[in-house]
């Protein structure tokens, strides 16, 4: 085995690509490394197309092995299970820029498997996996119009940083991943701390320029180690069939695409499609190979041609709007009475019901990653049920798309969330998509912002999101604001921007064609800003600022500080004290190592009671101070009295009364309340008490015992 190795410098890191030694039965395999973070990527491509296949079956699997970080998995089975949310998101990150680079009509099945086998805690494996997948596809010989490069861009001290380390990312105001070919950007995924449109565009351009090093290196690597290019030729278009479909459907489709209401339009289009299939199938000559799939493909291409040509010609869009008009907005807040915060955001035929829930720190999600555990205090979940598009379907665990859309919406809102110090709650937002016709993820951003404000979460600013589209024919192009589902499907770009009045918080871009210039992206960003400001204006009319107080049904969190040395006293032996406090008052208590105590309670009186009891437990006994106490036990030499914080002191027999006391039990009884003064606290912390001068003359024990018994029976 003679492995072929390509090594090059990429920013501050060294990238190594190796092939020829491992997984030699795969179509192509590459071991990609960046400073000790290593991802093994394989590509298997089938030579034959499955019969009846009418779409491109590309699958990307990304999997992290815990041995990569020198760890053994937790859980009963002690092995990796189904993909985590993070693994799913990285699989999508690999898929999105490579999918558009396969030619139209290529339906051979391809599976890419990226396995993280070694991890440097400072280098995230996602970029390494993307570079490895690009290299493996380039080596495989399949008709892939790559390679692609990938870059992460940070923004630290007003400077762009290429591929920042994990430590550098903590200081960065930007986390942007950009992928593209040598000619054009294909994908952007980013989260920002309210940067301007100009800064975001500059970051995309910077990342695309820097990744040319990767593209050049992969081209050299392919020249040395690549397999022969497949002699795949795109199938010749069936001109006669295309003309038949046009003759039957073109005029009727043109009319259908003037129906503005989605369901009515879809019914009309489905009826036309059924007619086309029925007519052509009936006319098929014996031995002629015309499948229903081919007819549908031509029909879809005709739909695309009609919609796109109208937009390029400057005609109104499908629903009658101009290119930069946002659909009608409708906003309601506080729609669910017992939730902590809720809102319904409707934009045309897209609608999101967003609900915010406040919880305590123990509700934080513990995420077990390769580099160790971390806790997440802001959770965002996106649900896309089939009824939202008028269909039936399975309902179960979230699909890849739901996970991806949820993460994008979370990125849009994360920059304006308060810190734990400012607002000591764990916050969960759930976006239920109840109607969908384009850009439900951006509706989720708007709905989440409204629900958080309704819940009284002190977000720094309202956030809105908008999806932009593009239709480009040769040198002519039109940028569309607030795209419909059809415009997304039939257009050349899906460009989503979320942000506040002052800047961008998230940007996601997927481009299906080459030739998108910085000029086009600048126009799209400017048009998106106008649309975003319009939406924010409507949102601010509905709820101008976060509510002054949280919901009556949300837990109130009260914070107090105690001496860290006293934490053990509040917890008690085996947790007995803190358990009694929570059970008796119906509160939950969290104590940090620095002595910060957080008490969560729906009822304010319960919280005040707990705080008073904790103050009592942690109070320092002072020499010379007078306290009320309770006799806990008697001895021949005196009585033990419990004072503040359940601390016991001894009243010596000589300190019980002014006169001589022969027998302690003649003066005191267990359970009796007495007033005592602290005489001394010795070096061992033992407390000496006296009842002289501070206590009234002690009565005879018979009356004392009677009083105690009466109290207990009361």
UniProtKB/Swiss-Prot annotation:
EC main group: transferase
Sequence positions that bind Mg(2+): 488, 494
Per the database record, which ranges form the S1 motif domain? 624-692
Subcellular compartments: Cytoplasm
Occurrences of domain KH (ranges): 555-614
Give the record's keywords alphabetically.
Cytoplasm, Magnesium, Metal-binding, Nucleotidyltransferase, RNA-binding, Transferase
Give the PROSITE patterns listed for this entry. Answer: KH_TYPE_1, S1
Reactions accelerated catalytically: RNA(n+1) + phosphate = RNA(n) + a ribonucleoside 5'-diphosphate
Does the record's keyword annotation contain Secreted? Answer: no
GO CC field: cytosol
Q: What is its EC number?
A: 2.7.7.8
Any Gene Ontology biological process: RNA processing
Superkingdom of the source species: Bacteria
Fetch the Pfam families from UniProt: KH_1, PNPase, RNase_PH, RNase_PH_C, S1
Q: Which cofactor does it need?
A: Mg(2+)
GO MF terms held by the record: 3'-5'-RNA exonuclease activity; magnesium ion binding; polyribonucleotide nucleotidyltransferase activity; RNA binding
What family classification does the UniProt entry report for this protein?
A: Belongs to the polyribonucleotide nucleotidyltransferase family.
Role noted for this protein: Involved in mRNA degradation. Catalyzes the phosphorolysis of single-stranded polyribonucleotides processively in the 3'- to 5'-direction.
> Could you tell me which HAMAP family the record lists for this protein?
PNPase
Subunit organization: Component of the RNA degradosome, which is a multiprotein complex involved in RNA processing and mRNA degradation.
Kindly provide the name given to this protein in its UniProt entry. Answer: Polyribonucleotide nucleotidyltransferase
State the organism named in the record.
Pasteurella multocida (strain Pm70)
What is this protein's gene name? Answer: pnp
